Amino acid sequence: MRLLIMGAPGAGKGTQATAIAEHYSVPAISTGDMFRTNIKNGTELGKKVKAIMDAGDLVPDELTDAIVVDRLNQDDAANGFLLDGYPRNMHQVEALDAYLKEHGQRLDAVISLDVDPELLTQRLLKRAEIEGRTDDNEETIRNRMKVYSSQTEPLLEHYRSAGILVPVDGVGEIDEVRQRIFAALDSKN
């Protein structure tokens, strides 16, 4: 199964991605995690990405596309994957579509976690406090919401018109939301 999980920052994508990936026996591939690993390890890519993420901006498409393609080419993604944090704009949608077409593949579904923006801000501030994430301060959160709204929300319409968007209410206990996701995906396939 080839899946995307989308939602504004703090919607619970990362929280749900691991369980969804395990359920469908595919790797969960998070661009944010890949970037944070590079930052933590002090790689050249990590240094570039840190400055961009600290400002609340999105990493340039060329960097993101290259990292995602490299990861999708690994053996464990041959029979499916769950992408979290990619694509985030139409250029990335086109890059992913081209990759899938070139490999004779298609997306099965795009999960959209829907959560009220005010609740998202509260979640992110709490997460920043618990995890010490420097990319989650109030000003950066507001900027990330704006960037998400302007660049990523139009993708939902693209996937809706392709008939593969699966909207899911992202508010509630983690297990509740997870069961909604499984039910929505199972009814789609």
From Swiss-Prot:
GO CC aspect terms: cytoplasm
Pathway assigned in UniProt: Purine metabolism; AMP biosynthesis via salvage pathway; AMP from ADP: step 1/1
Classification via Pfam families: ADK
A GO molecular function held by the record: ATP binding
Keywords: ATP-binding, Cytoplasm, Kinase, Nucleotide biosynthesis, Nucleotide-binding, Transferase
Domain of life: Bacteria
InterPro entries per the UniProt record, alphabetical: Adenylat/UMP-CMP_kin, Adenylat_kinase_CS, P-loop_NTPase
Location in the cell: Cytoplasm
Residues covered by region (LID): 126-136
UniProt xrefs under CDD domains: ADK (cd01428)
E.C. number: 2.7.4.3
GO BP: any one term: AMP salvage
Residues reported to bind AMP: 31, 36, 57-59, 85-88, 92, 133, 144
Chain residue ranges for the region called NMP: 30-59
Chief site of localization: cytoplasm
Binding site for ATP: 10-15, 127, 172
Catalytic activity: AMP + ATP = 2 ADP
HAMAP family xrefs: Adenylate_kinase_Adk
Family named by the database record: Belongs to the adenylate kinase family.
Known partners and oligomeric status: Monomer.
Entry-linked PANTHER family: NUCLEOTIDE KINASE
Domain remarks in the Swiss-Prot or TrEMBL record: Consists of three domains, a large central CORE domain and two small peripheral domains, NMPbind and LID, which undergo movements during catalysis. The LID domain closes over the site of phosphoryl transfer upon ATP binding. Assembling and dissambling the active center during each catalytic cycle provides an effective means to prevent ATP hydrolysis.
Main function: Catalyzes the reversible transfer of the terminal phosphate group between ATP and AMP. Plays an important role in cellular energy homeostasis and in adenine nucleotide metabolism.
Protein name, UniProt field: Adenylate kinase
Upper lineage: Bacteria, Bacillati, Actinomycetota, Actinomycetes, Propionibacteriales
Gene name, Swiss-Prot/TrEMBL: adk
